[in-house]
Amino acid sequence: ALPGPLPFILSRTYSSYRTKTPAPVGIFGPGWKAPSDIRLQIRDDALVLNDNGGRSIHFEPLLPGEAVYSRSESLWLVRGGKATQPDGHTLARLWASLPPDIRLSPHLYLATNSAQGPWWILGWSELVPGAEDVLPAPLPPYRVLTGLADRFGRTLTYRREAAGDLAGEITGVTDGAGREFRLVLTTQAQRAEEARKQRTASLSSPDTPRPLSASAFPDTLPGTEYGPDRGIRLSAVWLMHDPAYPESLPGAPLARYTYTEAGELLAVYDRSNTQVRAFSYDAQHPGRMVAHRYAGRPEMRYRYDDTGRVVEQLNPAGLSYRYLYEQDRITVTDSLNRREVLHTEGGAGLKRVVKKELADGSVTRSGYDAAGRLTAQTDAAGRRTEYGLNVVSGDITDITTPDGRETKFYYNDGNQLTAVVSPDGLESRREYDEPGRLVSETSRSGETVRYRYDDAHS
């Protein structure tokens, strides 16, 4: 990401885990997920938010302006169509910061995991209608990520293709600083054609490194266990416009990506065209990563069992680990033969480690509430620390240490910490302005530090 207000952050995560309802394969290939992959299904009896990890979070249908909160996911979902939220509502300030055309539209949905933002704006992409489509076309029964909005009213916008092979895919982004980025996407057929051209060039020039065999690069992708795959991949990200430096645009992409013949992410290059990451996959299980490497570091390798779980992590320059899976317990043994046992309770997204047997024979325990939030910890000496939580937000309201001493925490309507009262009765305080920025801190000794902001939108 380039620094600035509400910057465009292009991130990716990998998981070999496959849910029962896997999400469609995204622009980085099977197993890889990007934050922009989220989608909201709009049904008559429910709203279903599908995140980039294949999870399905269910909500009740919402009326215009109505909000709902998921305690287990710490996530708010709000439907547009209302100018204000009620006084004292956790999201009242954040809602008021939205541009009117966003918060007043009943066709938009907004999600956030913090009362300080940002909002994820869930809308729809404009598509070119077909010759047989009825006009005006009805809105689709789903919403996709179309942008972000922060608490200062700044927005980041995703531009999606309206027609062709890339219809619905993000190909452009404008961030909060007005910078414009172009995302270069390719199809499997285009990558196969490029492989054929490289092979032809290498045959005509014996000094050219030999590329992947064109015969091994099919025009269509093999099926995987990671969900439907259109074969569209991100190949490069370019900075196209920067209002601060309009004449100093880079002559190379900010990042570049290459892929295997199976559409798996193979390598990542930075703006100097230096390879910074490399990945390898199981030929029998497309998308299952078996090795990865950072530039200048040794390669980390993984072995899996028949169910697709990692059973060994091999590090040639450090500790390696073996994993044994049993009912409600996982045994981890390192290359020095030290063993740790993790005992779990709960299922699916609420599975938690409740007991750890450490290599030295000591045991620690943890307790959780019904939403999977930490409520207690017991150390190896049997000393127990308890955490009181706000039932709705999950914020810590008090901590009781093993000696019975209690520390209390207080928050404002936006879930921002305003005061901490220590066991000795001394108090520290924080104050915020209307947009939620910290303006003063008062220590336990009564000393106050004040903060001033030159820019009302900083």
Question: Where are the predicted features?
Answer:
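Acidic glycine-/aspartate-rich tracts in secreted/extracellular proteins
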Residues: S15-Y17
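Short, polar loop/linker segments at the starts of domains and inter-domain junctions
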Residues: K20-G31
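Eukaryotic proteins' extreme N-terminal regulatory segments
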Residues: A1-L2, K20
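Extended charged/polar low-complexity repeat regions
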Residues: L10, P30, D45-S458
